[in-house]
Amino acid sequence: MKNLFIGVDFSKEKVDVAIIFADGLTETAARVFNEFKTTVSGYKQLVKWVEQNSCGIDSSLWLFCGENTGDYSKGLCNFLYGKGYDMWLENAKSIKDASGLRRLKSDRADASMIAEYAMRNYDKAIMYEPLSESLAQLRELFLYRQMVVRHRCSFQVRRGEKRLTMEKSPIKTMISQSGRHIVSELNKEVEKIDKRIAELIKSDEELTEVFTIVTSVPGIGTQNAVCLMVYTDNFRRFNYDSRKIACYYGIAPFGNDSGTSVHSDPRVHYMANRQIKAMLTQAALAAVNFNPVMARYYMRLVERGKKKQVALNNVKNKLVHLVTAMVRNRQTFTPEYKISA
């Protein structure tokens, strides 16, 4: 049981902090507030301030909590983890939805709301653990590659539009040549990133093992494998639970029933990481074409009357369940794997 809950509201240049003293769900003292810079010295001042205002409560009974804001939250979380403090990094929407109607919006109020959320939902807390150094580097490379590919696609589309809409002129020629050069350079950059990703995976024994297992499934290529590894912390983030991974990917169907008048067939929810969901769609399409096991499964569903998009989503689910089980059991794919309908 924790008795000191520290809510942290992250921003680019500072963090706002609120402390709640509690015995169970009962607050035992007035809340205290402060703000600190997002620097190592600022983090040290934060911890020192909490110690001074902890009323003698041992640090093992503290719980820091904040919204997952990506890079903004990473610095303090890694600092607290390195010092041995418990840090809970929660989804921002979960905190907002659980906090009810709020009229006041300020950094201080947000920090207070986060601290209260931590107090009331302590039993759901998942303590923060940073990615391994190799996996963190792999994540940065993967995200950088995604950005470069988006820019390349943007220039390719732009060049195509100009080719169709502009009359021949020196300006059109200049734009076309410049665009061609930029696309060529971006292609070289993608190749460089792919080479670095391969070197990084090869240099780490665990990454090599998991990557080999995942890519042994026909239809799952390098980028889908890296995507799975990065977003699931080598499948440990969800404790090898394929249902949770499918939910995170946005491919798990959910029903909508209420009383006697509201009823709809289960369907996937809009809340998902759409970028990685699109990548899994590509993997499913490749699996249907090149993986005999998945192809037979897909055709059985279509023959039963399933719509093709529904059948394809089922293939995505099967891929996630299959890959998760293979990584958990440390086994590579063989055609003898049985996929139940």
Q: Predicted regions: what is each one?
A:
Residues 2-22, 114:
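Gly/Thr-rich phosphate-binding beta-strand-loop-beta motif of the actin/hexokinase/Hsp70
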Residues 54, 127-140, 167, 264-267, ...:
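Short, solvent-exposed helix-loop connector elements
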Residues 81:
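Anion (oxyanion) recognition and catalysis
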